[in-house]
A protein has these predicted regions:
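Catalytic phosphate/metal-binding cores of nucleic-acid and nucleotide-processing enzymes, i.e., regions
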Residues: 1-126
Length: 126
């Protein structure tokens, strides 16, 4: 989405949340190069940035209730984010102004989902 291009270019968006892929296919391996594009599958498609994957972790987001659960990729332990300042910080790392902005986006794009289960992919800029 175009709204995420400026924070990716500025280096403030360093993560993305994706639905899990079917079967054994992965989005990316830790340490692997990622190419971040905008307008995929259109004539306006362009590369935004090349980055390296820093982590891939299962994630659940309680959109209505206001929580995020991330399972650590290195130790398998889950931690839950509930405090407003921590939710705001998480949302900013994903390219949003704050948790309310992120929640509104999720409600508009996934109106029937109260709890989203997917994958959190983080990256570093080489």
């Amino acid at each position: 989405m175009r709204r995420f291009v400026p924070p990716i270019e500025a280096g403030t968006k360093r993560q993305t949340i994706r639905a899990p892929r079917a079967g054994r296919s992965r989005h990316v391996n830790v340490g692997g190069e990622m190419q971040l594009y905008t307008a995929m599958r259109t004539k306006h498609c362009r590369l935004i940035k090349r980055v390296h994957c820093a982590g891939v972790s299962p994630i659940k987001i309680g959109v209505a209730a206001g929580w995020v659960e991330i399972v650590g990729s290195h130790d398998g332990r889950a931690f839950i984010i509930r405090r407003q300042d921590s939710l705001d910080s998480f949302a900013r790392r994903d390219g949003f102004a704050d948790w309310d902005d992120m929640r509104q986006f999720w409600r508009e794009t996934h109106p029937d989902v109260d709890v989203f289960s997917g994958v959190l992919i983080t990256w570093v800029i080489p």
